[in-house]
Amino acid sequence: MGLYYCLREPPILTVIMGAKCVDGIVLVTDKKMTAEDGTFTYCDKIFGDLSHIIMGYTGWERTFDIFRKYIVGDLVINRDSKDRYTFSNYIPVASKSVKRFDKLVVDKCKHKFEVLIAKHQYEKSELHYINVDGTAIPIPYKAIGSGQNTADMHCGKLDHKNITMKYFVKRAYYSILYMDKFYPDLGVGIEDDDHPCIRYLENDKDLDREAPKDDKIECREYAINKLKEWNEKESDFLKD
């Protein structure tokens, strides 16, 4: 059947948000993956295949999986080469890989492939966005995927360098629930008894970690209350 046939109708990754905050870098994603026939599944969309490097992608699920294997394969093949991956050169080398990968696979697809990469090195941690041209851009905040515009509405104008990761997660959590409720066509969402995928890269920690359960519960309560406030305002507006 060939590679491009197998990529024809896989689920689409929907929204990924990243921010560099006062206490570290945080990545937040929904877990819903919607196929073109309307069916959907739930899974994590943030991966750390390499030490101190966390990635989130948008595009097709199978493209996403192939790219992960492509990066790891690149790492193995070039381990003795002058062009091998190191922690210091990871971003520019990964950018070249994204560009090559786009030419090999993504040019044949109708959904663009973008990457958010967080490099964890204490206070010097970096957040980068790699676009479809393979250009790496250092950023304080970025949302990618079908939910980008709505995420920007809720999270884009925050003073990221002066807020905590947990506060950013509260806003991102609210944005995900908002999209799930009011804009289902975006394909953004989580299961009723679950939380978004949340990874902390803290300034005072050596390793990244999943957000603690207590943080997730607190952020969920914030998001639900914000939705209630929005519903009440909308109801009052309609009454007028």
Where are these regions (language model features)?
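Conserved short S/T/G-enriched processing/targeting/catalytic segments and their helical context
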Residues: 3-111, 135-170, 180-194, 199-240
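Long, highly charged, low-complexity intrinsically disordered interaction regions
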Residues: 105-127
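A mid-sequence, solvent-exposed acidic-amphipathic segment
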Residues: 119-145
